[in-house]
Amino acid sequence: MSSNDSNDTDKQHTRLDPTGVDDAYIPPEQPETKHHRFKISRDTLRNHFIAAVGEFCGTFMFLWCAYVICNVANHDVALVAAPDGSHPGQLIMIAIGFGFSVMFSIWCFAGVSGGALNPAVSLSLCLARAVSPTRCVVMWVSQIVAGMAAGGAASAMTPGEVLFANSLGLGCSRTRGLFLEMFGTAILCLTVLMTAVEKRETNFMAALPIGISLFIAHVALTAYTGTGVNPARSLGAAVAARYFPHYHWIYWIGPLLGSILAWSVWQLLQILDYTTYVTAEKAASTKEKAQKKVKPAVPLLWLKSNFPLLFFISRSLALNVIIFGKN
């Protein structure tokens, strides 16, 4: 075996996969058996720990920033007389806070743990087989603990009561709230699947559309449900506020159903093998355009071929006009 082959083998043995896609990696010299996929090696435990730390730090950073911004936005005296009211300025501020917070948090920790930062997103990734079920459970625990920690930290660091907890408003019923949470989460999870899981040249920019989708979800839902779309966010805020409404379950069931709905749409596209047909259609269109040569119009060709004759005739006419004009 050459030295290069030896170095490659050493690199394979020490390879870690913090995103969880390659949890069950088996060294080449060990034949795979039915027991290997259930075996937990030291490197696998280390990978899970790295992912747990990444998800905790990313979720904490995201939710702490969002909670504080939401608290500032909701400390408006205009809401004292109308607690169910909603001001466009406040909605935009809250939406920007959550959208930009999740955007930079994903960019920071996507390379460490995948940057799900949301149990509903983690479920979609698990259903899409982007992460293993074990990694999904690890991410869930880290995200939920981070949500409670972020809620406690935001509550302790800011004066006044906690105003970032989720609650129904504008007369929204529990059933409507459930479906709003489901569809809002489905938009977010589908954005993750289509921009981060699908292999594209723009994968490195996935945090941008994900942040925009969360921004849009907050603009649409905040007045009605307070915009959960993230069980860790809803639980952390409820713990900080010590307020668990009897309909708190909609902030869990709704996002999880939305996660499954998003995966169903994504899975349908995979069954249809849309990438193959879209690529073939684009290639055919490009080939057709290349085969079409741009030809000048017929009048232009005639003028070009008869230019000397036309020049002689026009010159003769001009001279005749001049001669007759003098006469």
UniProtKB/Swiss-Prot annotation:
Subcellular location(s) of the protein: Endoplasmic reticulum membrane; Cell membrane
Highest taxon of source: Eukaryota
Residue ranges that the UniProt entry lists as topological domain Extracellular: 70-91, 158-176, 225-248
Membrane topology: Multi-pass membrane protein
Matching InterPro entries: Aquaporin-like, Aquaporin_transptr, MIP, MIP_CS
Domains: entry comment: Aquaporins contain two tandem repeats each containing three membrane-spanning domains and a pore-forming loop with the signature motif Asn-Pro-Ala (NPA).
Function in brief: Water channel required to facilitate the transport of water across membranes. Involved in sporulation, freeze tolerance and osmotolerance. Is non-functional in most laboratory strains.
The protein's name in its UniProt record: Aquaporin-1
Organism whose genome encodes this protein: Saccharomyces cerevisiae
Species lineage: Eukaryota, Fungi, Dikarya, Ascomycota, Saccharomycotina
